């Protein structure tokens, strides 16, 4: 929500330990001009997952026991950062049928060597709400900026697109 309120895409992420304690947080900061260190902001690389991972400082043993939670299925950039982070577990609340890239895991020798666990949407209503908020954000100036994105969302999560168009 904080990302949305600052004019960025409404995506957030956090890293938690094995007991569920939050160790770091990040949000999309693409449209923000300032952020405290270590967060990225003001460019197309300032994604929520990347910011949560940049803020996560821990040794390898703690990293391997941690989990990354994120609003939407990570894009190629964020999936790569997650993979490089040594965190072994990923949870996301909504599919991202246009840019989501968890399907890349296991497709190359490099992306096959770590035992990664991925957990996708567990709550269909939450996925609809997340998609609706993303649609509303993209249409906030009256125009959906990428029709292929909307098309992919419409095919995968039609109720979310319909709700987002009503907001």
List the predicted regions and their residue ranges:
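Short beta-strand scaffold segments in enzyme catalytic cores
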Residues: 11-20
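Immediate flanking context of iron-sulfur cluster ligation sites
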Residues: 61-72
């Amino acid at each position: 929500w904080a990302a949305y309120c600052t004019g960025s895409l409404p995506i957030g992420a956090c890293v938690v330990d094995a007991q569920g304690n939050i160790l770091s947080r990040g949000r999309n900061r693409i449209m923000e001009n300032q952020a405290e260190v270590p967060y990225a902001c003001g460019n197309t690389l300032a994604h929520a997952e990347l910011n949560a991972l940049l803020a996560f400082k821990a040794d390898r043993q703690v990293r391997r026991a941690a989990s990354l939670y994120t609003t939407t299925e990570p894009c190629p950039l964020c999936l790569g950062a997650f993979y490089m982070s040594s965190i072994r577990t990923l949870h996301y609340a909504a599919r991202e049928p246009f840019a989501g890239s968890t399907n890349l895991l296991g497709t190359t020798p490099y992306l096959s060597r770590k035992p990664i666990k991925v957990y996708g949407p567990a709550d269909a209503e939450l996925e609809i709400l997340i998609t609706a908020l993303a649609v509303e954000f993209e249409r906030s100036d009256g125009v959906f900026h990428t029709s292929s994105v909307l098309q992919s969302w419409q095919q995968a999560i039609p109720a979310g697109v319909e709700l987002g168009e009503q907001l």
